[in-house]
Amino acid sequence: MTMPQQPQVNVNISQPPLPPQQPPVRQSNLRTKRSLLKYVLLGLITLGIYDIWQMSEVGETLNLIATRRDGKRTMHYYLMFFLVGWLTLGIGWLVWFHKLSSRIGTEQAARGLPVTVTAATYWLWNILGSLIIVGPFIYTYKLLHAMNDLCADYNARG
């Protein structure tokens, strides 16, 4: 009677180890040159189209930067501007900017950057600041520069 033979396992020890996992390669660096002057002037020249595009780009960029960390997604601004904002008689815009500002502040804190934009910044500068006319401009300046800082940090550290 013959004994069944054990299968032979070929272990090749001389095989080189797998290379370490590389982080996903970013296709291009994120924009870091948002400015209030360009936002206002191009907004006037294009009758607001540039402003809509810029806020859409801010939301998409924030999704790219922060979704890994917090698991949230900001609603696309085109959907907010053309549909939800009008259907909710403006309340949708208030909620969208509140959440956007809060998320920017949270991401700044998580990355160790100075927190310059929060939900309070939105309510105090953009809403109450409307009474002194320059408040919304100050809020927009802070928002655009906070996004520039986040994008620069993302370009440097991922």
Could you describe each region identified by the protein language model?
Residues 2-84, 92-129, 136-158:
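Membrane-interface extramembranous regions at the lipid-water interface
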